[in-house]
Amino acid sequence: MQKKIYIKTFGCQMNEYDSDKMVDVLNASEGLIKTDTPEDADVILLNTCSVREKAQEKVFSDLGRLRELKFNNPDLVIGVGGCVASQEGDAIVKRAPYVDLVFGPQTLHRLPEMLKQRRSTGRSQVDISFPEIEKFDHMPPAKVEGATAFVSIMEGCSKYCSYCVVPYTRGEEVSRRFEDVLAEVAGLEAQGVKEITLLGQNVNAYRGEMADGEIADFALLIEYIAELEGIERIRFVTSHPKEFTQRLIDAYAKVPKLVNHLYLPAQHGSDRILAAMKRGYTSLEYKSILRRLREVRPNISISSDFIVGFPGETDADFEAMMKLINDIGYDNSFSFIFSPRPGTPAANLEDDTPHEVKLQRLQRLQAVIDQNTRRYSDEMVGTVQRILVEGPSKKDPDELQGRTENNRVVNFAAGEHGARLIGQMVDVNIVQSFAYTLRGEIIVKQ
């Protein structure tokens, strides 16, 4: 019987990408195939995230539930990867000695060797080192199902925002070689992928070495990927405003395949709080980026992150954030109350704002964002949108769903066209809007 692997993924798209790579690596080396049922698995991996509060406790809670599976099947391999693993290291094994493997984001390619060592020595294996970009040299070719795919172009972050653990868990910024990224995208194109999402903690900082020794910036990488005929859409996350260059803005003018949507986290609107966060820009500088971008893409959809209740945030600071939100008119936002991450400078800052006040601020902020989201969706009714059909609708398996350029899910009846539309670009007339989705009718070309 073929052995199986189960992976539970927490957090960002980078982790989703890494989880797919774990499956690829262990399929190539061990013949493992993916299962959605932990009880059926021979290997169980938790790919963790440490960005939010109590991340470690959530991991140990999950490990506690897996302990019984290990008791009933001593040959079961349990591993913890990702950013919590990078932070905690040996402490995970000390607290949960039944864990076999602990590995960081940069060492997932070493899983086959770690498994081998675990079996031969009987001892838990821990490797949370930062061997730069080495992991991409040991990856088997990507295998995908569907018309969309993630491609990691760089690892780590060197910005050291005062609240963020990423530089400590994923290391400094390191870019993949230019031709390696293009080769991966071309391989995905050959498998029928039409939409690529380029990933990095700060994609704007991409500086990939080319075959001739020159260095390619992010804008040049986008331009080359756009030359691949089968790739029809290009997305990317995450961007840091400090390095959102004029060259990248110019790419929006020159590359129609860049979608009409940008996720550009502001985090706050008060210059005083932005300085305390060590973000490296002012509210005015942030708005200047979007003003110049909207000169070349007037209707571009903008989403962001906002942290409410950063230590020392006053009513005036919060009002400055609300002013930024109203000035920009965000389409969507990931907004949350500040939670101190151990080991970061912000964790040591005095926080005298009551939780009730933070909660009220968050609710007010999110209400404005939600109004914007609904208004933009309502304005799409009566328009024709080109969508990439991703598969059956989650609401009705007899229907299909796709996604617009501005990241709206559209559900529609496929009729006689059926499943053959999956993976195709089609035009739909938007006939109804809901809180987070749209309803469309497919336009049949004569």
Curated annotation (Swiss-Prot):
Covalent S-S links between cysteines: none
Residue sites binding [4Fe-4S] cluster 2 per the record: C157, C161, C164
Span of domain Radical SAM core: 143-375
Residue ranges of domain MTTase N-terminal in the record: 3-120
Protein name: tRNA-2-methylthio-N(6)-dimethylallyladenosine synthase
Catalytically driven reaction(s): N(6)-dimethylallyladenosine(37) in tRNA + (sulfur carrier)-SH + AH2 + 2 S-adenosyl-L-methionine = 2-methylsulfanyl-N(6)-dimethylallyladenosine(37) in tRNA + (sulfur carrier)-H + 5'-deoxyadenosine + L-methionine + A + S-adenosyl-L-homocysteine + 2 H(+)
Co-factor note (free text): Binds 2 [4Fe-4S] clusters. One cluster is coordinated with 3 cysteines and an exchangeable S-adenosyl-L-methionine.
Annotated keywords: 4Fe-4S, Cytoplasm, Iron, Iron-sulfur, Metal-binding, S-adenosyl-L-methionine, Transferase, tRNA processing
Domain TRAM: 378-444
Necessary cofactors: [4Fe-4S] cluster
